[in-house]
């Protein structure tokens, strides 16, 4: 993978992460989730941290792991009926 392709993948994941965070935030608001220890709030924090790791990633494998976290959060939201 070229450096250009790697940068494009980072950009795509930044957008995907922003979308997941927005969906999780909406879910939290709609369900009046405020406590930081609620599983959805913890999932939000995990996704937030994963999004922050995108630009410091050095390999495609790291980006694949981050994308997997985003996919898990999306699957949760889908099963919860939010998407």
Placement of each model-derived feature along the sequence:
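N-terminal acidic leader/helix
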Residues: 2-33
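Acidic, low-complexity, intrinsically disordered interaction modules
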Residues: 26-65
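Alpha-helical and His/Cys-centered functional microenvironments
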Residues: 14, 56, 73
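A general marker of short, structured functional hotspots
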Residues: 2, 23, 40, 66, ...
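Short amphipathic alpha-helical interaction elements located at domain edges
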Residues: 2-6, 10, 36-39, 76-83
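Amphipathic alpha-helical binding modules
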Residues: 62-83
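Amphipathic, well-ordered alpha-helical segments in soluble domains
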Residues: 16-23, 46-49, 69
